[in-house]
Amino acid sequence: ATSNSKPTQVLLATFLTFFFLLLNNVNSSDELSFTINNFVPNEADLLFQGEASVSSTGVLQLTRVENGQPQQYSVGRALYAAPVRIWDNTTGSVASFSTSFTFVVKAPNPTITSDGLAFFLAPPDSQIPSGRVSKYLGLFNNSNSDSSNQIVAVEFDTYFGHSYDPWDPNYRHIGIDVNGIESIKTVQWDWINGGVAFATITYLAPNKTLIASLVYPSNQTSFIVAASVDLKEILPEWVRVGFSAATGYPTQVETHDVLSWSFTSTLEANSDAATENNVHIARYTA
């Protein structure tokens, strides 16, 4: 569900403020924090896979663009080079994290689009799977959607209404994916062609909740989805974080441009550090 009212934005802003206060006050043993306001070609802090690159204007282009036009069957990923410790095998502690980024998806023909992009966490040595992976957003293929993947992702899926992807709902959507392309929770996404989207994804370790939210400031619409996800049961102790995107048929192409990105994670030394008030976030889901 969606909302175009200010109360939703106030709730979101209040939650995010509260989350960062939580991160700043816990006794942490490991943390990673970075902000990239403008990407540069051959960005040293990023690992590029497939056809991902940085343009001369400082935009992270996850899929191939030639002469300003998106190209068919393009797959690309960009990951932050430094691994993130998402949980501690000795103490059992699990990290909370928050990531925010702005991005644009622009299609020559907005009525038929594919395939979308995703933010994901995966093993440090994760690579683009072999085979045709466009409809799997460069994260999976038709033979590896199982627990061996060790991948958690939030997808921004632009392809819908086709039997080719029977797992998808009949609308563009934001989905939470665990080890496979079929989302465990989705919310309808009223994508704006060429609009700048502001996305925030947070994970609250004390109650194992992953929350994804997206706002289009240009028309004051927001979208929020949340699900229970146990990162310690799904991911290895160390992961890399990044983006993946893909395009499909020649008539169903789009750009996948990330304009800025920030990330903060804190591995709590005491998993009971959060109070009851810190985990009441179900009210923000639609």
Swiss-Prot record:
Domain of life: Eukaryota
This protein's UniProt keywords: Calcium, Glycoprotein, Lectin, Manganese, Metal-binding, Signal
Positions with a binding annotation for Ca(2+): 157, 159, 165, 168
Gene Ontology MF terms in the entry: carbohydrate binding; metal ion binding
Disulfide partners: none
UniProt keyword Manganese, yes or no: yes
Database matches in PROSITE patterns: LECTIN_LEGUME_ALPHA, LECTIN_LEGUME_BETA
Residues binding Mn(2+), per UniProt: 155, 157, 168, 173
Propeptide: 278-286
Annotated positions binding N-acetyl-alpha-neuraminyl-(2->3)-beta-D-galactosyl-(1->4)-beta-D-glucose: 73, 115, 135, 159, 165
Signal peptide as annotated in the record: 1-28
Positions bearing carbohydrate: 89, 141, 207, 219
UniProt keyword annotation of 4Fe-4S present: no
InterPro entries assigned to the protein according to its UniProt record, in alphabetical order: ConA-like_dom_sf (IPR013320), L-lectin (IPR016363), Lectin_LegA_CS (IPR000985), Lectin_legB_Mn/Ca_BS (IPR019825), Legume_lectin_dom (IPR001220), Leguminous_Lectin (IPR050258)
Listed SUPFAM superfamilies: Concanavalin A-like lectins/glucanases
Family in the record: Belongs to the leguminous lectin family.
Function in brief: Sialic acid-binding lectin specifically recognizing the trisaccharide sequence Neu5Ac/Gc-alpha-2,3-Gal-beta-1,4-GlcNAc/Glc.
Listed name of the protein: Bark leucoagglutinin
